[in-house]
A protein has these predicted regions:
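Catalytic core of pol beta-like nucleotidyltransferases
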Residues: 2-29, 36-109, 120-201
Length: 201
């Protein structure tokens, strides 16, 4: 009986991971927690007990993309990484770090390029953008920095058809800035040289 229940739970985890991966691949949901919750509802689960973790969902996403998006996703990822390199070169004075799906290789047509930037004065980025005539929107996001919470300015712009999110931290917070999802395999942040290496440059 216990073995059957365990097998059933494993099957449900795999089903939810697959459904979450499909939502991320086909509907552009970027948030793992939201995709997981929506997938659980689709699977008819009333609570969050025994749901897959981010690593399982990421593995399912890679499998889904390999099966159903192999003709398009690699080219989309390459374009986003090329744009990321372009932006990181232009914003080199802010010590940019690439995070998220463009780095881990699961990005697709719906994905943003997400960069962490570092400045003595966060307002200096707004001046930098204005001087280069970028059109952008701005807000703030509450994020955890070490043991504390902070409001981090976020700038949203478009470069070569790709949406770019710039999160601006104080220079002293580089070692505290979020490192993407802690469960994910592989590097969670990358400097310009690392991204260039991914492109074979």
């Amino acid at each position: 009986m216990a073995r059957n229940r365990s097998r059933r739970d494993d099957n449900l985890r795999r089903q939810v991971a697959y459904l979450a991966a499909r939502l991320m691949a086909e509907e552009g949901i970027a948030d793992y927690a939201f995709a997981k919750q929506k997938a659980a509802r689709q699977a008819g689960l009333a609570d969050s007990h025994g749901l897959p973790d981010n690593r399982e969902i990421e593995a399912a996403l890679r499998e889904y993309q390999g099966l159903y998006q192999s003709a398009s996703q690699p080219a989309e990822l390459k374009h986003l990484r090329e744009v990321a390199v372009k932006v990181m070169r232009e914003f080199a004075g802010f010590n940019p770090l690439l995070v998220g799906s463009v780095l881990n290789g699961t990005a697709n047509q719906f994905s943003d390029i997400t960069l962490q930037l570092f400045a003595d004065d966060p307002k200096s980025l707004a001046l930098f953008l204005l001087n280069r005539r970028y059109r952008f929107e701005q807000d703030e996001r509450r994020v955890r920095l070490g043991d504390d919470w902070a409001r981090v300015p976020q700038y949203y712009l478009e470069v070569d058809g790709a949406p770019v999110t710039l999160a601006v931290y104080s220079r002293g917070d580089e070692h505290l800035a979020p490192r993407s999802r802690p469960e994910s395999d592989g590097p969670q942040r990358a400097r310009l040289a690392d991204v260039e290496a991914l492109l074979g440059r």
